[in-house]
């Protein structure tokens, strides 16, 4: 990926095949030379390794609410988004310690941080991000039980007790594993995944905003349930969030 050729805005692309078990996607956020940008990061159940031009590398832990961001004009931010079951093993720490936190990579993995600290050019940083990610994943592969559990929890009707039994763990064991590997327990992960399902449906049909129908499709009990959860996870009403994403 030629980072310098990317247009202003947010872009995602697939990770190399060797990393796809652990990495959901690679991404970049670019601002134009003429204007800064403010944004809002919403929970997705993932942890990201991030390189920001002028700052260096840091880790964005799993969020449980919206996080406001600001980028100066002419800035590039690069990211590696770990799958829910991969962040904790790759970083070698319980991700519950990074829930709703941002931490310099130097505090967690000094060797990879030193490598990225020397990168001033975004294209060089992009290549070094992949090298650093490969080293992290080699040290800690995704947790197979949590990988399986996360797939099952995409079903809004799934019960945590049944998911635990399906993956061969007690409910207490599943909670502990999810806290360490994902950053929060299975019920919170399920809430976040259901919310992302709502967002995906809104993005797919921006011209049709039938919130009651979308709420039912995404697994919410009713539109009021969607409104409560959207407020907790995004700080907005569903209609406001949908309008913002369509803009």
Predicted regions and their residues:
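DNA major-groove recognition helix of helix-turn-helix
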Residues: 178, 190, 229-231, 242
């Amino acid at each position: 990926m030629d980072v310098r050729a990317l247009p202003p805005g947010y872009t995602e692309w697939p990770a190399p095949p060797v990393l796809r078990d652990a990495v959901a996607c690679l991404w970049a956020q670019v601002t134009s030379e003429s204007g800064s940008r403010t944004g809002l990061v919403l929970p997705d159940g993932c942890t990201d390794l991030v390189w920001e031009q002028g700052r260096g590398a840091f880790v964005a832990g799993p969020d449980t609410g919206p996080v406001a961001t600001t980028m100066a004009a002419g800035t590039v931010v690069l990211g590696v988004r770990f799958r829910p079951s991969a962040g904790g093993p790759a970083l070698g720490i319980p991700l519950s310690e990074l829930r709703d936190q941002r931490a310099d990579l130097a505090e967690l993995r000094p060797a990879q941080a030193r490598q990225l600290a020397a990168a001033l050019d975004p294209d060089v940083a992009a290549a070094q991000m992949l090298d650093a990610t490969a080293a992290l994943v080699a040290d800690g592969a995704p947790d197979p039980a949590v990988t399986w559990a996360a797939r099952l929890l995409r079903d809004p009707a799934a019960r945590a007790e049944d998911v635990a039994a399906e993956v061969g763990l007690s409910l207490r064991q599943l909670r502990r594993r999810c806290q360490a590997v994902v950053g929060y327990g299975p019920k919170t992960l399920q809430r976040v995944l259901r919310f992302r399902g709502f967002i995906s449906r809104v993005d797919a049909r921006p011209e049709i905003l039938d919130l009651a129908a979308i709420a039912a499709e995404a697994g919410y009990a009713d539109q009021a349930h969607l409104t409560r959860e959207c407020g907790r996870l995004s700080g907005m009403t569903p209609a406001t969030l949908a309008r913002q994403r369509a803009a």
